Amino acid sequence: AKMNLSSYILILTFSLFSQGILLSASKSIRNLDDDMVFNTFRLGKAFQKEDTAEKSVIAPSLEQYKSDESS
């Protein structure tokens, strides 16, 4: 239990630390950020195309998720 707690604190500290760095450096990496968002958007489009091909596999679990959420 102690090991899990320490690793959790480490992860928490790291995430806060990295957020702080991103926040302070956001002005200099704003262009890079926009590129990343654009690439992620294009990636999402590509995944959507694949998704339509795999819908027959994914659909059942997706429907179950929707019904779980509404209850």
Curated annotation (Swiss-Prot):
The keyword Signal applies. This is Pro-MCH. PANTHER family: MELANIN-CONCENTRATING HORMONE, PRO-MCH. Belongs to the melanin-concentrating hormone family. The keyword Cell cycle does not apply. It comes from Hylobates lar. Residues 1-20 form the signal peptide. Its main location: secreted. GO terms for cellular component: extracellular region; synapse.
